[in-house]
């Protein structure tokens, strides 16, 4: 990294719930003199069935670096496995083409698992918020 160049943090968001928690982090990254935001939108955000919540991110004015659609399979155990496999491949391709200095994920949904797996295999440092939290319902 050249002197004065910002470190790039890829923030992965797949749902409205975790985006609400990541929004302040994204805002701080945008304002940072040392770090830059590389916002990657995936999962339910890009699904008509789940409300196309990417529009909320756009309304907030946050720049979206990439949109990675992954919900192409049925909501079955096999379909989820297929989604995870495809998502790992898509995240790996994106991270390889436009490598961040760090990948930031929140939670443990399968799209987050896929992004974390790709980052780990590619030896990109991973920051993980709220992994292992227990949710009910």
Give the positions of each predicted feature.
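N-terminal subdomain of nucleotide-sugar transferases
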Residues: 1-44
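Flexible, glycine-rich phosphate/dinucleotide-binding loops
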Residues: 18, 46-48, 135
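Membrane-targeting and insertion segments and their boundary/processing signals
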Residues: 27, 61-65, 119
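Conserved nucleotide-sugar phosphate-binding/catalytic loop shared by glycosyltransferases and other
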Residues: 36-80, 90
């Amino acid at each position: 990294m050249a002197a004065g160049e910002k470190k790039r943090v890829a923030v992965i968001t797949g749902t409205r719930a975790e985006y609400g928690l990541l929004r302040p982090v994204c805002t701080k990254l945008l304002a940072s003199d040392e770090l830059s935001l590389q916002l990657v939108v995936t999962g339910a955000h890009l699904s008509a069935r789940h409300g196309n919540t990417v529009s909320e991110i756009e309304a907030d004015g946050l720049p979206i670096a990439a949109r990675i659609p992954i919900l192409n399979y049925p909501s079955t155990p096999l379909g989820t496995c297929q989604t995870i496999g495809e998502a790992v491949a898509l995240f790996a391709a994106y991270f390889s083409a436009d490598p961040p200095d760090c990948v930031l994920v929140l939670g443990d949904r399968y799209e987050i698992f896929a992004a974390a797996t790709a980052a780990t295999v590619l030896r990109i440092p991973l920051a993980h918020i709220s992994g292992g939290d227990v949710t009910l319902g």
